[in-house]
Every structure is written in structure tokens, then in C-alpha cells.
Amino acid sequence: MASLFDKNSFQMTRLQKTAVAKVVGVSLIMLLAACSSDQRYKRQVSGDEAYLDASGLHELKAPVGMILPVQNGTYEVQAGSMQGAVGKQLDIRPPSQPLALLSGSQTQFSGNSSTVLLENTAQNRDLWNNVVKAVEQNNFKIANRDDANQTLTTDFVDWNRADEDFQYQGRYQISVKQQSYQLALTVKTLELKQQDKPVTSSAEIQRYNSQMMNAITANLDKVQQDTQARLDNRRVGEIDVQSGADDTGLPVLIVRESYGVVWDRLPNALTKVGMKVTDSSRPQGTLSVTYKPLNDDAWQTLGAKDPGLTSGDYKLQVGDLDNRSSLQFLDPKGHALSQSQNDAMVAVMQAAFSQSNAK
């Protein structure tokens, strides 16, 4: 009987411990879940708060018979009352501000509006259209749009910040106006609320107004970078090649690009036309190449006709003409190309440069 009782007692004890462990585990999970949803720690100062319990200032009382120094206002601690949040209620996040992300831009914030001032240049000619695209690409719903006056009003934008317990919603007026020689992109907060209650805190209005402005200008900055990249790529492809002559009257190719750019792009361009660089000297401007004519399909792909050069080893002299460069091909016998061959190489090198980048 004793043995059976001990066994039952052991099983009951084990069941009780298991139940307790489960309860503790569930409680711990609930506690962690509660902590993970409380974002106040991201806004609160950490450390000792004993200063909040410090006693206030009081008049200094000297013992009888002691003569105090003459009072000097320089060292006097002024008594005053402080208004605003303290301790854990104090929001330590720095104020948000509109960022000057765009080239040549200036930013400012006043009241409930942020403004980005831009140069009224060709680069910003389509500013309004790009602003509308930026709003749409950020999935900000447009409630009203007036292209004639370059003004739009958003519907409520649902902000989602990890440092907020309850998210904010805001409505904004976005406009582009000309101010003297500048363009002014302005974002005005029309309404800000949290849990369906109006928010009047200037810090919060500035925070979410700046967030809207920065979302727009970040998109505009990307548009500017993409546009500049396309222009750069276009310039890379659009090297103009013409036929010319040197001081002695021998035919050369004139490339309307600087020596450095031409030199950097020549190896790839020459490869496109069947010329393999075997040796080169940048200081002397010389290259040695071995030429093997392309087949008909390759010439068609390049977009140029066979210039009629024979196979063999050629020399290429590159000349620096300030903002232009010269190219002179010497055949395997050391002779300059004929005028007809040189003229044929104009289209060949024009096509080769357009399809090649720097090495």
C-alpha cells in the first residue's frame, strides 16, 4: 500500500509541476508579447530617475552669529517652474526636418508647412509631374488634383512607425509654385490625428509633415539620378567621329571627345571591329593591334560596312587635340590608310564607340 501511495503521490506531483510549468510558460509568452507591442522604450530616456524626487530650492539659513558673503546675482539659482513632460513621459526623439536631398535645394519648416526650394532650371522643368508620380508611387491616395495651379490634396495617409504605440493619420496639401528664380515645393499639413483624435502637438505635426516631404523628395532624387544616368549613357554612346587630315595632309579620324575618354574606350571599341590590342602606350598615344576582318553577319550586327582592310598587324596613333582627339591607322606596311579607307572607318568607329564602354 505504501509503495502504491508513493507512486501515486509522485505522479500527482509531476502533473502539478507540469501544469505549473505550462502556466509559467504561457504567462512568459504573454509578458513578452505585451512588451514587444509597447514601443515607449524607443521614445523614453533610460537611466536613474531619482532627480524627479529631488527637493525644491529653499532659502539659505545661516546659524546665529555667522555673517554670509554679500549676495552676488551671478551665482544665484533662479527659482522657476517647468512645464512639459518629464521622466518617462518625455519624448527624447530628435525633431524631424525636411532633408535637402535634391541637387541645389534648400529646405525650411514653418508652422505646419515644409518647403523645398529648387533652382528653376531645365532639370526641374517637369517638377510638378514628377511630384504627382512620387505621390502615386508611394501609394498616397490623391483626393483632389489641380494641374493648372499645380496643387493636390491627399486623402488620409496611414503612417506606420515602429516607435509609436498607436499610428498617426494625416492629410496634406502639396503644391509647386514659382518664387522669383526658384521653384517652391511645399507640403502643408491639413489634419493630423491619432486614434481618431486631432493632434495639435507642433512636434508631431513637424515629424509627420517632414516624413511626407522626405518621402516625396527621395523619389524625386531617384528620378534625377536615373535621368542623369540616362544622359551619361547617351553621352557615352554619342561620340561623334569625322574624317579629317593631319598637318601633312594624311587622312585621320577626328573624334569629338577628350583624349582620356577616347583612350579608355578604344580597346573595347577596337575589339568590336575585329582589332585585338597587343601593345599600348598611353603617354605616347600608340597602340598595336592585330586585325582579323569580321564576317558579314558581324558587320551587320555592328551596323557598319566592311572598310576593306587586309588582315595583319596595324599601328594606331592617338592625338590629343584638347577637347577632341585624332586617330591615325597605319597598315602592316607602315602606310597611312587611303582616303577611301579612312572615310570607311568613320562609320565603323562611330558604330564601335556607340556599342562600347570604357575598359
Curated annotation (Swiss-Prot):
Keyword Signal: yes
N-palmitoyl cysteine-type lipidated residues: C35
Pfam families per record: Lipoprotein_18
Keyword annotations: Cell outer membrane, Lipoprotein, Membrane, Palmitate, Signal
Gene Ontology terms describing biological process: Gram-negative-bacterium-type cell outer membrane assembly; protein insertion into membrane
Domain of life: Bacteria
Compartment(s) of residence: Cell outer membrane
InterPro entries membership: BamC, BamC_C, NlpB/DapX
Protein's membrane topology: Lipid-anchor
Summary of subunit composition and partner proteins: Part of the Bam complex, which is composed of the outer membrane protein BamA, and four lipoproteins BamB, BamC, BamD and BamE.
Chain's role: Part of the outer membrane protein assembly complex, which is involved in assembly and insertion of beta-barrel proteins into the outer membrane.
Family: Belongs to the BamC family.
Name assigned to this protein: Outer membrane protein assembly factor BamC
Organism: Rahnella sp. (strain Y9602)
